[in-house]
Amino acid sequence: MSSIIFSAKDIFEQEFGREVRGYSKVEVDEFLDDVIKDYETYAALVKSLRQEIADLKEELARKPQVSSAPSPSHPDPIDVAASSSMTNFDILKRLNRLEKEVFGKQILDNPDL
């Protein structure tokens, strides 16, 4: 990561040589004033974010470590019921499709069934 070359003070105190056909001094000064304001804003933002990072790291260090994997000895009853009903529903759909394949022609040929 490269280091910061200029501070807001460096930009403010920068002197430029004068030439006959140069830029407007007023426009350059106004532009540099805006650049200085941006630098000050970025510096404050970086300081704030570094403090936030430090606070979050401290908070993380204080919290007990929790396992991310659920305990297999205590499955959630809602999850078990949902997966069971989905499995039953899937089985019924497959059974229906197989019956149509196997008995479909017989049902179409014999309308009494």
From Swiss-Prot:
Source taxon at top rank: Bacteria
Subcellular localization, per the record? Cytoplasm
Primary subcellular site in the record, as a coarse category: cytoplasm
Give the GO biological process terms.
cell division; regulation of cell shape
Q: Where is this region: Disordered?
A: 61-82
Keywords, comma-separated and alphabetical: Cell cycle, Cell division, Cell shape, Coiled coil, Cytoplasm
Coiled-coil spans in chain: 36-65
Q: Which Gene3D superfamilies match?
A: 6.10.250.660
Q: Which InterPro entries match?
A: Cell_cycle_GpsB (IPR011229), DivIVA_domain (IPR019933), DivIVA_fam (IPR007793)
The entry's cellular-component GO terms read: cytoplasm
Instruction: Indicate the family of this protein.
Output: Belongs to the GpsB family.
What's this protein's function? Divisome component that associates with the complex late in its assembly, after the Z-ring is formed, and is dependent on DivIC and PBP2B for its recruitment to the divisome. Together with EzrA, is a key component of the system that regulates PBP1 localization during cell cycle progression. Its main role could be the removal of PBP1 from the cell pole after pole maturation is completed. Also contributes to the recruitment of PBP1 to the division complex. Not essential for septum formation.
Q: Provide the assembly information.
A: Forms polymers through the coiled coil domains. Interacts with PBP1, MreC and EzrA.
| Name of the molecule in the record | Cell cycle protein GpsB
